[in-house]
Amino acid sequence: MASYKDIVVDATSGTDVGAVDNFSFNHTVGSGNEGILIFIYSSRGAIAVSGVTFNGVALTSGYVTGKFDNFLSEFWYLLKPATGTHSIAVTLSTTDNNRHCAGAVSFFNVEQTDPFKVTDEQSGTASSFSNSFNSTLDGQYAIDGQSSSSDVAGTVVAGQTLIKARTSTESCGMSYKSLGTSGAETVGWTGFSSSLPYMDGVVVIQPAEEVGAAAILLTL
């Protein structure tokens, strides 16, 4: 029976900027094995991310939600990112009219093949929400990104860790959560200014498998 490592949370970062078509911010990656850097972009409008780099290396687009009232979230990733402090540089398809925020989180001991094991989205009109999905393996982590018409960014529910939140005419935020035992899970936000349109996206990563003595012998 396979055994798995414990995912290690490395670092978070984030930014919110004005009406631009490109921007950058720094993220610091520590030392560890089987690393992943995840970039999250939440926005409203006819905007898409054209490209993202970290230390000049391109990230891969892993999941983009649908649009609800023009709200969306995007998730990009880079496997084995360089250690140290480097720039995350983002290029947008067109100028974002001050309606976005971006965050990043890095982990170690993460499965490197097809890293987003579960993807999910939920949209609606509410002053708070709980997005339900199913995890598929013990020890997974969920990363979510949301944006809404609220002029208050809202608060993550218990068990989630905030990565970045932005309060403006359209607010947004992102977080991560350790999922524990596989099965039914939720992520959520509360405290929006009133019942307003929102979109929330989720991706799930899973721990890397331990390489035991038997597996090592098979490779000899």
What are these regions (language model features)?
Residues 1-220:
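Primarily extracytoplasmic/secreted proteins
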